[in-house]
Amino acid sequence: MAIEAKVVWSEGIFITPQHFQQFERYLESGLRQLAVSQEGHFWGFSSLVLNSDGLKRGVIGINEAEGVFPDGSVFLFSQKQLENLSLKVPANIKDTKICLAVTLPSSVNNEIYFPDQDSSDSCRYKAFNKTLADTTNTELDGRQVTLADLNPMLVLENDLTSGQTALPIALIRSSSADFEIILDESYIPPCLGSQKQPHLKAYISEIYGLLMQKSNSLANAVNDPNTGGC
């Protein structure tokens, strides 16, 4: 994704919301490009906890998610953002990935979903109101400001569009006719670190144990005079 063009702030211009929107796109696109350019594959989860309580009913959710999307968008979703995030998986599917997705940035489509709108699926952000204090003088009354968080969604990999960036969270081994989901427990989502991923952590611990065992064995052999050691 290209870096957005910079706004020219010149004397006498009539400032409109588009100026600030483009200025924000310029800054955000630069940050995303910086994240991506640090390393070719610098994306994945630094933390991921699935909500599997509804698997027998064909529903999967997320309790915790933090990381970087492939386009460089950084995320740390709050409990409020995740509490209504779930996917009803169709019956009779198998070997299909479930993905956490957000809409890619756009300069031509609506990016903000407001509560009075019908659907939020195509919007990158979801708006909400919050009263903020003036931090130069906190004795003044706060002012209500409209803010927006990233608008995450769960989708099957086959249903992803070119207008979304996504990370797979799980692999469905099968879903039965009555919708019960069976996940592939050996599947490892893309990760930025190993210590919060149980499978990777276990593999590393096992390798470490084998190396220590081999190291001790070699050390004993070297120090044993009966085997030609010192």
Positions of predicted regions on the chain:
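Mixed-charge (acidic/basic) macromolecular-recognition segments
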Residues: 124-230
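N-terminal accessory/cap region of cofactor-dependent oxidoreductases and related radical enzymes
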Residues: 84-156
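Glycine-rich, compositionally biased intrinsically disordered regions
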Residues: 2-116, 222-230
